[in-house]
Amino acid sequence: IKAGIVPAELIFTNPHYRPEMQGRRPPGDIWTHICGVDLVRTGEDGFVVLEDNCRTPSGVSYMLENREMMMRLFPDLFAEHRIRPVETYTDMLLASLRASAPEHAGADPNIVVLTPGPFNSAYYEHSFLADKLGVELVEGGDLFVNDDIVFMRTTEGPKRVDVIYRRIDDDFLDPTVFRK
């Protein structure tokens, strides 16, 4: 904006612009862990980005399940065409989430996947990812804050949460600021 490259009104009239976030820095200065990019092939060597989604990208569970089934049904096809593997996705995601944990969490931080619940269109994916990552799937009501520390309610009592992989749209993240 200051350089005059991007018009101010383009930013300030965007429905995803969050003035409440001005001056805030994310933990570890990590602005996004996952970005879903939809590519379209335009020719032999050409690609165009159709959409990028850094907020709450979804669809990876279907891709992973599809690939597993396709490899089972057509193993020769994958060998002949040197199709790159994708089965390490959840390992890489877990490593990224662990790397974002605060130092006090140690080598095995408590990570949760935060979902809006079973009525969300991407709930299958939230459940799938939590299962593959080996972490808890939680809703907002499962969490509470005490002395600036997030805890998860469990049958064994409160358990500290070190990393939240949120799968809630920005508009519904904080009911004191955004939509309720």
What is each stretch, according to the model?
Residues 1-180:
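Domain-scale recognition of functional cores that engage charged ligands
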